[in-house]
Amino acid sequence: MTLRSAEEGREYTVRSVDTGDEEMDSFLFSLGCYAGEPITVVSHLKGSCVVSIKDGRYTIDRALADTVAVG
């Protein structure tokens, strides 16, 4: 399952991140979005997804949300 299809308000564990872009993978890693870390989907908005990672909230677009596998 990816972040795009994840249920709002539920905490998941990041299983993998594969954007196909090393720079974007590094950016997500710097936010704390990497395998084994908890992530919560706060809400799904039109064209984007709001997530909580560690102590921050971030809005990511649908394409990026599709690259983050959670379980």
Predicted feature locations:
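Short alpha-helix capping/helix-loop boundary micro-motifs
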Residues: 23-27
